[in-house]
Amino acid sequence: MSGSTGERPFGDIVTSIRYWIIHSITIPMLFIAGWLFVSTGLAYDVFGTPRPDEYYTQERQELPIINDRFEAKNQIEQFNQ
């Protein structure tokens, strides 16, 4: 070994009581926050994806497939009408 960086060894960290007290709270909170982010629909708003009931309208039930990449903008505008 060429020297020490001054950091605590990983084994000491994961066997400490303080580590488990902190992480027993923060890890479940991350899962709960993610679940709330998705279940409230905020994820759809943040990332701009349509909600499951917005993919197809009553007027348009076919798949919106783009056929010509040079006319893609016009085709997308037609799909959104």
From Swiss-Prot:
SUPFAM superfamilies: Cytochrome b559 subunits (SSF161045). Keywords: Electron transport, Heme, Iron, Membrane, Metal-binding, Photosynthesis, Photosystem II, Thylakoid, Transmembrane, Transmembrane helix, Transport. Coiled coil: none annotated. GO terms for biological process: photosynthetic electron transport chain. Heme binds at H23. It is found in: Cellular thylakoid membrane. The chain crosses the membrane at residues 21-35. Its cofactor is heme b. Pfam families: Cytochrom_B559, Cytochrom_B559a. With its partner (PsbF) binds heme. PSII binds additional chlorophylls, carotenoids and specific lipids. The keyword Thylakoid applies. The keyword Heme applies. HAMAP family: PSII_PsbE (MF_00642). Heterodimer of an alpha subunit and a beta subunit. PSII is composed of 1 copy each of membrane proteins PsbA, PsbB, PsbC, PsbD, PsbE, PsbF, PsbH, PsbI, PsbJ, PsbK, PsbL, PsbM, PsbT, PsbX, PsbY, PsbZ, Psb30/Ycf12, peripheral proteins PsbO, CyanoQ (PsbQ), PsbU, PsbV and a large number of cofactors. It forms dimeric complexes. Belongs to the PsbE/PsbF family. This b-type cytochrome is tightly associated with the reaction center of photosystem II (PSII). PSII is a light-driven water:plastoquinone oxidoreductase that uses light energy to abstract electrons from H(2)O, generating O(2) and a proton gradient subsequently used for ATP formation. It consists of a core antenna complex that captures photons, and an electron transfer chain that converts photonic excitation into a charge separation. This is Cytochrome b559 subunit alpha. It comes from Microcystis aeruginosa (strain NIES-843 / IAM M-2473).
